[in-house]
């Protein structure tokens, strides 16, 4: 059950409208993120706009201490069309505060760069992290990947779509209210025009792609494919809660290790809301999971 503390905070937050002009939506998304990116934690350093290759950059949040540090590759949410390393800056720095070199990827966005651009960027980032982590005294063979919403989709898709040698680099996945079966999500959310538009935009209107396991990675779950997964669903999430439950069920069916936690009464997007008790509870559980698996 949601706490009164969290209920009060959520009632005061501005509302983002996921419809309308893409430029205006992106501007509103980044403005809303300034509300979340206050009281940034103290870390070893933050390197902005690090170039991974032409057209692909990331913010790299560096922990304090000598290392070698484990690595987290983080994929921001935003319907494959919004968001940036800046919108998720505080979350990336919180990973670094906990001792993880954190690469918050600025993957290419739709509609300018529809599928498979963001997925290709994510897959490239895994190999890049393995090869370059030592630049920040970090361990290129102790990598976790994570993401929220669309970022959760990309995290799972990157693992299931990669060759075995690349897939083996990822020791764990942390997944917050992701979309893992876009075909089912689109059917379930017909009454939500904003989400329908985001889903369609990601695949450039070619909704047949929803059946592609690179787009809907739930269809690629099989024994030995995914590392241990930490799955968090938002209890008050009409968009993606069913996806989190379905992923857990699919992993259970193939005896693949996972944890599932549903934060009751909490909305989609809460992993940017660090003042929530539900956020702090999810983070405590995640630190324990990562300590065991990375």
Question: Whereabouts are the PLM-identified features?
Answer:
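Alpha/beta-hydrolase superfamily serine-hydrolase fold, recognizing
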Residues: 1-294
